[in-house]
Amino acid sequence: MPDQFTEALNAPSGRLAEILLKKLTRTDDGGEMSEEMQARFEKLIRAEGEFGDLARVRLAADVPFLFDRAPRWTTENILSLFDWSSPDARAAWSSRKYSTSIGSPELMSLVKEPFLQLFGRSDMEENDIETFADWLAAMMLANQSGETDYPINATEARASLR
Protein backbone atom coordinates (compact mmCIF):
# COMPACT_ATOMS: atom_id res chain seq x y z
CA MET A 1 0.00 0.00 0.00
CA PRO A 2 1.57 3.33 -1.02
CA ASP A 3 2.10 5.98 1.61
CA GLN A 4 1.04 9.60 1.23
CA PHE A 5 4.48 10.70 0.07
CA THR A 6 4.36 8.21 -2.80
CA GLU A 7 0.88 9.47 -3.65
CA ALA A 8 2.15 13.06 -3.52
CA LEU A 9 4.96 12.30 -5.95
CA ASN A 10 2.39 11.28 -8.56
CA ALA A 11 -0.33 13.81 -7.76
CA PRO A 12 -0.71 17.19 -9.48
CA SER A 13 -0.18 19.08 -6.21
CA GLY A 14 2.95 17.08 -5.40
CA ARG A 15 4.34 17.70 -8.86
CA LEU A 16 3.58 21.40 -8.52
CA ALA A 17 5.36 21.44 -5.15
CA GLU A 18 8.37 19.77 -6.75
CA ILE A 19 8.48 22.37 -9.54
CA LEU A 20 8.37 25.19 -6.99
CA LEU A 21 11.16 23.55 -4.99
CA LYS A 22 13.31 23.34 -8.13
CA LYS A 23 12.71 27.03 -8.84
CA LEU A 24 13.58 28.06 -5.28
CA THR A 25 17.10 29.42 -5.20
CA ARG A 26 19.18 31.07 -2.56
CA THR A 27 19.01 34.86 -2.80
CA ASP A 28 22.21 36.81 -3.32
CA ASP A 29 21.64 38.86 -0.18
CA GLY A 30 20.86 35.82 1.98
CA GLY A 31 17.23 36.88 2.32
CA GLU A 32 14.01 34.97 2.06
CA MET A 33 12.31 33.84 -1.13
CA SER A 34 10.68 36.44 -3.34
CA GLU A 35 7.14 37.60 -2.63
CA GLU A 36 6.01 35.94 -5.86
CA MET A 37 7.43 32.58 -4.74
CA GLN A 38 5.96 33.01 -1.26
CA ALA A 39 2.53 33.60 -2.77
CA ARG A 40 2.82 30.45 -4.87
CA PHE A 41 3.97 28.29 -1.97
CA GLU A 42 1.30 29.72 0.34
CA LYS A 43 -1.48 29.10 -2.18
CA LEU A 44 -0.28 25.51 -2.45
CA ILE A 45 -0.02 24.79 1.29
CA ARG A 46 -3.34 26.45 2.06
CA ALA A 47 -5.24 24.42 -0.53
CA GLU A 48 -8.02 22.32 0.94
CA GLY A 49 -8.78 18.64 0.56
CA GLU A 50 -6.52 15.97 -0.83
CA PHE A 51 -4.81 18.46 -3.15
CA GLY A 52 -3.58 20.49 -0.18
CA ASP A 53 -2.82 17.43 1.94
CA LEU A 54 -0.54 15.96 -0.72
CA ALA A 55 1.15 19.32 -1.37
CA ARG A 56 1.98 19.68 2.33
CA VAL A 57 3.23 16.08 2.48
CA ARG A 58 5.52 16.70 -0.49
CA LEU A 59 6.94 19.90 1.02
CA ALA A 60 7.41 18.25 4.43
CA ALA A 61 9.90 15.83 2.90
CA ASP A 62 12.06 18.75 1.78
CA VAL A 63 11.84 20.86 4.91
CA PRO A 64 15.67 21.01 5.32
CA PHE A 65 15.97 22.45 1.80
CA LEU A 66 13.14 24.92 2.41
CA PHE A 67 14.59 25.95 5.77
CA ASP A 68 18.00 26.50 4.21
CA ARG A 69 16.52 28.74 1.49
CA ALA A 70 13.79 30.50 3.49
CA PRO A 71 14.11 29.90 7.24
CA ARG A 72 11.59 32.50 8.38
CA TRP A 73 8.95 31.46 5.86
CA THR A 74 9.49 27.76 6.59
CA THR A 75 9.26 28.35 10.34
CA GLU A 76 6.04 30.31 9.94
CA ASN A 77 4.36 28.06 7.36
CA ILE A 78 5.74 24.52 7.39
CA LEU A 79 7.18 23.59 10.79
CA SER A 80 3.76 23.62 12.47
CA LEU A 81 2.88 20.59 10.33
CA PHE A 82 5.31 18.55 12.45
CA ASP A 83 3.69 19.45 15.78
CA TRP A 84 1.59 16.56 17.06
CA SER A 85 -1.37 18.87 17.60
CA SER A 86 -1.56 19.28 13.80
CA PRO A 87 -3.78 16.87 11.86
CA ASP A 88 -0.95 16.75 9.28
CA ALA A 89 1.75 15.66 11.77
CA ARG A 90 1.81 11.92 11.16
CA ALA A 91 1.87 12.37 7.38
CA ALA A 92 4.49 15.13 7.65
CA TRP A 93 6.81 12.97 9.75
CA SER A 94 6.20 9.93 7.58
CA SER A 95 7.19 11.87 4.46
CA ARG A 96 10.12 13.48 6.28
CA LYS A 97 11.87 10.11 6.37
CA TYR A 98 12.42 10.45 2.61
CA SER A 99 14.49 13.59 3.04
CA THR A 100 18.09 13.44 1.90
CA SER A 101 19.17 15.51 4.90
CA ILE A 102 18.50 15.49 8.62
CA GLY A 103 18.70 19.25 8.52
CA SER A 104 20.70 21.84 10.35
CA PRO A 105 21.00 21.97 14.14
CA GLU A 106 18.90 25.14 14.00
CA LEU A 107 16.10 23.34 12.16
CA MET A 108 16.26 20.39 14.55
CA SER A 109 16.06 22.74 17.53
CA LEU A 110 12.73 24.00 16.17
CA VAL A 111 11.25 20.50 15.79
CA LYS A 112 13.11 18.86 18.68
CA GLU A 113 10.11 18.17 20.93
CA PRO A 114 7.85 16.59 18.30
CA PHE A 115 10.87 14.70 16.93
CA LEU A 116 11.58 13.14 20.33
CA GLN A 117 7.86 12.50 20.91
CA LEU A 118 7.48 10.49 17.72
CA PHE A 119 9.43 7.59 19.25
CA GLY A 120 6.64 7.04 21.78
CA ARG A 121 3.74 7.28 19.37
CA SER A 122 1.74 4.20 18.49
CA ASP A 123 0.47 5.70 15.22
CA MET A 124 3.92 5.78 13.60
CA GLU A 125 5.05 2.95 11.32
CA GLU A 126 7.90 0.83 12.67
CA ASN A 127 10.10 1.50 9.63
CA ASP A 128 9.60 5.25 10.13
CA ILE A 129 10.72 4.93 13.75
CA GLU A 130 13.79 2.97 12.63
CA THR A 131 14.73 5.68 10.14
CA PHE A 132 14.43 8.39 12.77
CA ALA A 133 16.39 6.29 15.28
CA ASP A 134 19.18 6.19 12.68
CA TRP A 135 18.96 9.98 12.43
CA LEU A 136 19.16 10.24 16.19
CA ALA A 137 22.30 8.09 16.21
CA ALA A 138 23.83 10.20 13.43
CA MET A 139 23.15 13.38 15.41
CA MET A 140 24.74 11.89 18.51
CA LEU A 141 27.83 10.87 16.52
CA ALA A 142 28.06 14.32 14.91
CA ASN A 143 27.81 15.94 18.34
CA GLN A 144 30.43 13.61 19.79
CA SER A 145 32.88 14.26 16.95
CA GLY A 146 32.47 18.00 17.37
CA GLU A 147 31.32 18.33 13.73
CA THR A 148 28.19 20.14 14.76
CA ASP A 149 26.00 20.75 17.77
CA TYR A 150 22.57 19.22 17.38
CA PRO A 151 20.24 20.27 20.22
CA ILE A 152 19.62 16.73 21.47
CA ASN A 153 21.86 15.28 24.15
CA ALA A 154 22.56 11.63 24.90
CA THR A 155 20.19 11.55 27.89
CA GLU A 156 17.29 12.87 25.78
CA ALA A 157 18.09 10.43 22.99
CA ARG A 158 18.21 7.48 25.37
CA ALA A 159 14.95 8.50 27.08
CA SER A 160 13.11 8.89 23.77
CA LEU A 161 14.11 5.41 22.62
CA ARG A 162 12.79 3.65 25.73
Positions of the model-derived regions?
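Non-catalytic all-alpha helical scaffold/repeat segments
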Residues: 1-162
